[in-house]
């Protein structure tokens, strides 16, 4: 078996000749400085030198190259390379199995987590729906539209502190929601003094003069007259 040939160093260039003494000096001045930082600083200082300052080191590098050629006439630059078995070494410390036939384990884990969160949210929704049904069970069984029976609910409230306004803040003759006067009866109407083009129900006569007047019910469009509403008003008076 042939003995491996000894490694022959390359001849120094001008920068290496100059930095040999400078590196030693900088390492003594900064003992904790890393070698890479020293090389970086030496490279910056070398670039700042003028050609006249670099000339002696260039000449010394030429002389060393000539000596190197005499000593090693068959020299070829062969950079050191790492063995191929180290390069091809497995880069992953933990082997992760990936089987396309059975499905991705990471994907299945993610899907199971999503299913768990969906089941929790569905359970919360069902609990809230059950609580709502329990709360409104007796109201829904007695009346399919419990929220439309507003007159009976308002009559159960305590009397208002002011005679002209109800507890909910509306005038005594005005229902809690617009349009509910039709459900509660009193379809009779009269023209509004503030706005001639509107009709107001008769049950709003108890409003104070300074109270808010909300025109509603009928609007006279351009080209229409009040007489066109008379048949309806006459029919409403008979109800």
UniProtKB/Swiss-Prot annotation:
Any one Gene Ontology cellular component term annotated for this protein:
nucleus
Q: Which residues bind DNA?
A: 8-76
State a single Gene Ontology molecular function.
DNA-binding transcription factor activity, RNA polymerase II-specific
Q: Which UniProt keywords apply?
A: Developmental protein, DNA-binding, Nucleus, Repressor, Transcription, Transcription regulation
InterPro entries registered for this protein in UniProt: HMG_box_dom, HMG_box_dom_sf, SOX_fam, SRY-related_HMG-box_TF-like
Tell me yes or no: is Repressor among this UniProt entry's keywords: yes
Q: Where in the cell is it found?
A: Nucleus
**Which Gene3D superfamilies does this entry report, sorted A to Z?**
High mobility group box domain (1.10.30.10)
GO:BP terms for this protein?
brain development; dorsal/ventral pattern formation; negative regulation of DNA-templated transcription; negative regulation of transcription by RNA polymerase II; neuron differentiation; positive regulation of transcription by RNA polymerase II; response to steroid hormone
Q: In which tissues is it expressed?
A: Expressed in all cells until gastrulation, becoming restricted to the developing central nervous system later, where expression is in the forebrain, midbrain and hindbrain but maximally at the midbrain-hindbrain boundary.
> Source organism's superkingdom?
Eukaryota
Phenotype of gene-disrupted mutants: Ventralized embryos.
Primary role: May function as a switch in neuronal development. Acts as a negative regulator of transcription. Plays a role in dorsoventral patterning of the embryo.
Q: What is this protein called?
A: Transcription factor Sox-21-A
Identify the species of origin: Danio rerio (Zebrafish)
